[in-house]
């Protein structure tokens, strides 16, 4: 018991605990009198000059409100002291239930809360993970350059039957049992054959058609089609082909390199730039894949219980991220804010994120890891490189403690993962570039 309050702790199972705190009647009266005098010194009351009304008058007008304020202040101070006394690591916001506060009587309240788990880290020694190595061949590079040529192709109208890789302009109307369905029709619709933008059978059915020709296609929607009204249903699409356009690819020469921003070095410099970009893309993905494998091992070796309050807070965060993404995609921020999202689909991801956060914090603490200034600078420069004035952005980050701390957290996480990597056995596995691209697209 402290001088002005008494507290008792009760373990409810798992990470849940309960504090019962009773503030003495003397402390209630002392706090009330102090607050009353403070209010009386500044209160503006009709017929009295500011601060000149007697405490009795102020009490008559504001006594109940003052008592409620005193209750809040006593909870704040006594709860902080009780947490220190019992050496509690409270996770999330506590749930406080208080009795009515009365002058001359002890003030009791109950606090239900969760604590952080006690973590004893298990080393990852003896565990093995695979590190994927990707070799980019000259053939891979040639294919990428060919894809770039297609991106910069000029489309010319041709008078012949449509074939794969052509761009076509069509009118179409879809029907179910002879009746048009919602979003099943379009006019002057542009489509590249072979893009797999449409359901199976649609693009293939247009191949061989001539400009001006009409055709009916019998197509069944996939059973897993997103719209339940259409999934698994047999439809008829009446299609009229308006135009066929074929790609005219640019020549792979110095002029083409200039179009892609290569001012010196011509075609050879372009090949090197494209190779570098390909390497960066697969390296970033494979590093992230390796990192996730390490973190999965960390969770497997260190099963911990996590506070439900932190999981719920993380679900809130993930849902907010979803709403922001929808707002960016739809350009309708007000509608996105009002979106009602179910919580259960986010629970597994939220639980994993909370576990990783707690475990990585323990890795940082146990190994006394500090954010490496050079790595921090490199991260800031990486972010700044995408802006028009990188130096200005770098200066802004270093003058903004909150933004810099966010990047510092990323650097600490990378260093923690590097520490975990040093404990593991790593086996290298080589895969072709095309396989790496498939993994990236999954």
From Swiss-Prot:
One GO biological-process annotation of the entry reads:
chaperone-mediated protein folding
Q: Which domain of life is it from?
A: Bacteria
Query: What terms describe the molecular function in GO for this protein?
Result: peptidyl-prolyl cis-trans isomerase activity; protein folding chaperone; ribosome binding
PPIase FKBP-type domain: residues covered: 165-250
- Where found, per UniProt? Cytoplasm
Q: What is its main location?
A: cytoplasm
As recorded in UniProt, its EC number(s) are 5.2.1.8
UniProt-recorded name of the protein: Trigger factor
Q: What does this protein do?
A: Involved in protein export. Acts as a chaperone by maintaining the newly synthesized protein in an open conformation. Functions as a peptidyl-prolyl cis-trans isomerase.
Instruction: Write down the chemical reaction(s) this protein catalyses.
Output: [protein]-peptidylproline (omega=180) = [protein]-peptidylproline (omega=0)
Keywords, ordered alphabetically? Cell cycle, Cell division, Chaperone, Cytoplasm, Isomerase, Rotamase
Q: Which family does it belong to?
A: Belongs to the FKBP-type PPIase family. Tig subfamily.
Enzyme group, top EC level?
Answer: isomerase
* InterPro entries per UniProt: PPIase_dom_sf, PPIase_FKBP_dom, Trig_fac, Trigger_fac_C, Trigger_fac_C_sf, Trigger_fac_ribosome-bd_bac, Trigger_fac_ribosome-bd_sf, Trigger_fact/SurA_dom_sf
Organism from which the protein derives:
Coxiella burnetii (strain CbuK_Q154)
Gene Ontology CC terms = cytoplasm
What the entry says about domains is: Consists of 3 domains; the N-terminus binds the ribosome, the middle domain has PPIase activity, while the C-terminus has intrinsic chaperone activity on its own.
